[in-house]
């Protein structure tokens, strides 16, 4: 099997919440694409709820783009501990943290979930505003760091 960057990370030595630049790729035409690990909860200790994580995905899709022009995608991790963000350009981790703090703060102000209907969402019933707010609040209270390894 090809070496996968995320499998090389020692998950026993990280301290969530954090943002980590997981890699940069340069395409054949010179396009730069960055990938970030937005870790919300501690691997192998905590999980984001399915409904809360799905709702956060909907909010982050919009709010992160309010602060970052070159977002390609934000996707939930299969391990349910955070999200991956991909963007064009070599963006600084501090800019991602600032956008994420802004986005999670905006989640706390919301009263309805964007695109939570069968026309716009493939799992429209798998949402919870309450759980999304709870996850956002927890991450903000714990503070998002750019230092991800425990010393």
UniProtKB/Swiss-Prot annotation:
Cofactor binding description: Binds 1 Fe cation per subunit.
BP GO annotations: quorum sensing
SUPFAM superfamilies linked to this entry: LuxS/MPP-like metallohydrolase
Disulfides per UniProt: none
Keyword hit for Iron: yes
Swiss-Prot/TrEMBL keywords: Autoinducer synthesis, Iron, Lyase, Metal-binding, Quorum sensing
Lineage: superkingdom: Bacteria
EC number: 4.4.1.21
InterPro entries named among the record's database cross-references: LuxS_sf, Metalloenz_LuxS/M16, S-ribosylhomocysteinase
Cofactor list: Fe cation
Positions bound to Fe cation: 54, 58, 121
Gene Ontology MF: a single term: S-ribosylhomocysteine lyase activity
Pfam families: LuxS
Catalytic reactions of this protein: S-(5-deoxy-D-ribos-5-yl)-L-homocysteine = (S)-4,5-dihydroxypentane-2,3-dione + L-homocysteine
Matching HAMAP family: LuxS
Family in the record: Belongs to the LuxS family.
Subunit structure: Homodimer.
Function as written in the Swiss-Prot or TrEMBL entry: Involved in the synthesis of autoinducer 2 (AI-2) which is secreted by bacteria and is used to communicate both the cell density and the metabolic potential of the environment. The regulation of gene expression in response to changes in cell density is called quorum sensing. Catalyzes the transformation of S-ribosylhomocysteine (RHC) to homocysteine (HC) and 4,5-dihydroxy-2,3-pentadione (DPD).
Name of this protein: S-ribosylhomocysteine lyase
Source organism phylogeny: Bacteria, Bacillati, Bacillota, Clostridia, Eubacteriales
């Amino acid at each position: 099997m090809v070496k996968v960057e995320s499998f090389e990370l020692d998950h026993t030595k990280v301290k969530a919440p954090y943002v980590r630049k997981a890699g940069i790729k340069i395409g054949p035409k010179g396009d730069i694409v960055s990938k970030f690990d937005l870790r919300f909860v501690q691997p192998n200790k905590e999980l984001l709820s399915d409904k809360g994580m799905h709702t956060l995905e909907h909010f982050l899709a919009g709010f992160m783009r309010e602060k970052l022009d070159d977002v390609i995608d934000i996707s939930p991790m299969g391990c349910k501990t955070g999200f991956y963000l991909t963007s064009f350009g070599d963006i600084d981790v501090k800019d991602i943290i600032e956008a994420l703090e802004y986005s999670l703060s905006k989640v706390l102000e919301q009263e309805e979930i964007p695109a939570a209907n069968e026309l716009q969402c493939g799992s429209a019933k798998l949402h919870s505003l309450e759980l999304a707010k709870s996850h956002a609040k927890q991450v903000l209270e714990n503070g998002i760091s750019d230092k991800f390894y425990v010393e």
